């Protein structure tokens, strides 16, 4: 007879996210040894990071004369991922909308405002973006505050939307939201730093 697993053995938790890393590559989590090469570290607004599954849809089959279910079937709920990034950096805009949606503006000049600072001939530089529908694919790695544990979510399919609701107190930000396109694939992993080479 196998011994019961006691509650102290169940304290295997993940919390306190500190850093979110993004890689455009899909990660094969069915392999025992995996390399992930992030391209960018994303600044994520506190408490905006969410990863949760919707409740399952339960179908109840009943027969005459019995109060309970004769049979039940279910469909799993969608896995939802979302977070908010308060940045308008070029690298971020490229991730969100694609290379072809980005144009670098080398000089934009304001004229006739009557404000010498705004009308300066030096002009302004920046980035123009077409905020089109663009599927963000790849892998995100969430690092805990002790850098000892990781949560990896791959096969992501996210979309970005501009958010600037509280313009007096908050910066321009983009909300990433979407799901996992990983039917039949291992798409989530929780990892703990190995104590020696080769440990996981």
List the model feature ranges, each with a label.
Residues 2-44, 197-200:
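Polar/acidic, low-complexity leader/linker segments enriched in S/T/G and N/D
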Residues 3-7, 86-129:
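Charged, amphipathic alpha-helical segments
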Residues 28-31, 90-93, 142-153, 184-188:
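Short, surface-exposed beta-strand/loop "edge" segments at domain boundaries and coil↔beta transitions
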Residues 42-59:
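N-terminal beta-strand/beta-hairpin edge segment
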Residues 57-69:
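Short acidic (Asp/Glu) patches
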Residues 68-93, 169-185:
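Oligomerization/assembly interface segments of phage tail-like spikes and tubes
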Residues 119-165:
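Acidic, glycine-rich flexible loop segments
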Residues 148-200:
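Mixed-charge, glycine-accented linear interaction segment located at domain edges/termini
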